[in-house]
UniProtKB/Swiss-Prot annotation:
The gene is NAGA. InterPro entries: Aldolase_TIM, Glyco_hydro_27, Glyco_hydro_27/36_CS, Glyco_hydro_b, Glycoside_hydrolase_SF, Melibiase/NAGA_C. Homodimer. One of its GO terms (molecular function) is protein homodimerization activity. It comes from Homo sapiens (Human). It comes from the Eukaryota. GO terms for biological process: carbohydrate catabolic process; glycolipid catabolic process; glycoside catabolic process; oligosaccharide metabolic process. This is Alpha-N-acetylgalactosaminidase.
Length: 411
């Protein structure tokens, strides 16, 4: 009997694991919510309402303006697409706003070399009051999404109980697996449980989800960015070890290109999200985005760092009385990303330090490339003093890599 029990538990664990092999690096793409919310007024605002046309136009921009080629491949529908359920209980899109249906949209997106994401909610209703996915609908909805050739599912948690979430998220992971279609799974579960143990089991989440929202929704303001960043830093000892290839912490969307951030703050969010190994999911109007903001989001070295195959989430390693913070992320080939972040609100600050003060040791000579300016800083040893000038609410970001090991060269 004991052997049977062990075998049964092993089978259950195997079924529950989201064994899709996806998102070995953080996902990159575009998500509708932050910029376009639940705008369903297509009569008065046809260019900006949640509709088939909006997603097709964003897909065009992603394919034609360099986004896809830089790695931004997911085009994700959020709330307010659902029109109801048909007589057999299958979800249907709003017929007026998505007249050709989701399979048509998926085919269009795929024809451009992109992937389509969709939204559902573990509960009676979505957050905006559309039909949700109750426990008895989980398998059916997973099958529907697979038949529609969807590539990612974001499962929200409004209007559900802790018990329903505890059953529903693992059940959806198993149901997605059972479809045979690789569908990346974005879980909002921990955000509804306070984001921390013991109410959140991150070992389980890593088995059943490819990414998960831990904390509050981002809003279009610098205060919102800081509140999310500070929460992640406060709990980094818990959060940092659980992220890795195939399973990522998600501090929510990038605001860059919208209305609430200055240029310095936009550069800061991009750098900080990158050092946290966060998903890079834009939520802006790609039809009107400025060249300046495109440069931030399409920075090749930034994207290389974000997509580093080691998949190690970075940490804050220093917090100075001067309101300067330093973040570090280990990268492949013994390289590192360093972010010098100013929480000041007065004027540019001259920050003096050395690699030794930042816990780099050993007889190694480093070179650093400034991720935004492209400048190269050569001849850095652990005892070499350097100065970076950081603008208020801004960053200086380095890609730091070893060029010579003095001990090995002396042998």
């Amino acid at each position: 009997m004991l052997l049977k029990t062990v075998l049964l538990l092993g089978h259950v664990a195997q079924v529950l694991m989201l064994d899709n092999g996806l998102l070995q690096t953080p996902p990159m793409g575009w998500l509708a919510w932050e910029r376009f919310r639940c705008n369903i007024n297509c009569d008065e605002d046809p260019k900006n309402c949640i509709s088939e046309q909006l997603f097709m136009e964003m897909a065009d921009r992603m394919a034609q303006d360099g986004w896809r080629d830089m790695g931004y491949t997911y085009l994700n529908i959020d709330d307010c697409w659902i029109g109801g359920r048909d007589a057999s209980g299958r979800l249907m899109p709003d017929p007026k706003r998505f007249p050709h249906g989701i399979p048509f949209l998926a085919d269009y997106v795929h024809s451009l070399g992109l992937k389509l994401g969709i939204y559902a909610d573990m509960g009676n209703f979505t957050c905006m009051g559309y039909p949700g996915t109750t426990l008895d609908k989980v398998v059916q909805d997973a099958q529907t999404f697979a038949e529609w050739k969807v590539d990612m599912l974001k499962l929200d948690g409004c209007f559900s109980t802790p018990e329903e979430r505890a059953q529903g998220y693992p059940k959806m992971a198993a149901a997605l697996n059972a479809t045979g279609r690789p569908i990346a799974f974005s879980c909002s579960w921990p955000a509804y449980e306070g984001g921390l143990p013991p109410r959140v089991n991150y070992s389980l989440l890593a088995d059943i989800c490819n990414l998960w929202r831990n904390y509050d929704d981002i809003q279009d303001s610098w205060w919102s960015v800081l509140s999310i960043l500070n929460w992640f830093v406060e709990h980094q000892d818990i959060l940092q070890p659980v992220a890795g290839p195939g399973h990522w912490n998600d501090p929510d969307m990038l605001l860059i290109g919208n209305f609430g951030l200055s240029l310095e703050q936009s550069r800061a969010q991009m750098a900080l999200w990158t050092v946290l190994a966060a998903p890079l999911l834009m939520s802006t109007d790609l039809r009107t985005i400025s060249a300046q903001n495109m440069d931030i989001l399409q920075n090749p070295l930034m994207i290389k760092i974000n997509q580093d195959p080691l998949g190690i989430q970075g940490r804050r390693i220093h917090k100075e009385k001067s309101l300067i913070e330093v973040y570090m992320r280990p990268l492949s080939n013994k390289a590192s990303a360093l972010v010098f972040f100013s929480c000041r609100t007065d004027m540019p600050y001259r920050y003096h330090s050395s690699l030794g003060q930042l816990n780099f040791t050993g007889s190694v000579i480093y070179e650093a490339q400034d991720v935004y300016s492209g400048d190269i800083i050569s001849g850095l040893r652990d005892e070499t003093n350097f100065t970076v000038i950081i603008n208020p609410s801004g960053v200086v970001m380095w890609y730091l890599y070893p060029i010579k090991n003095l001990e090995m060269s002396q042998q």
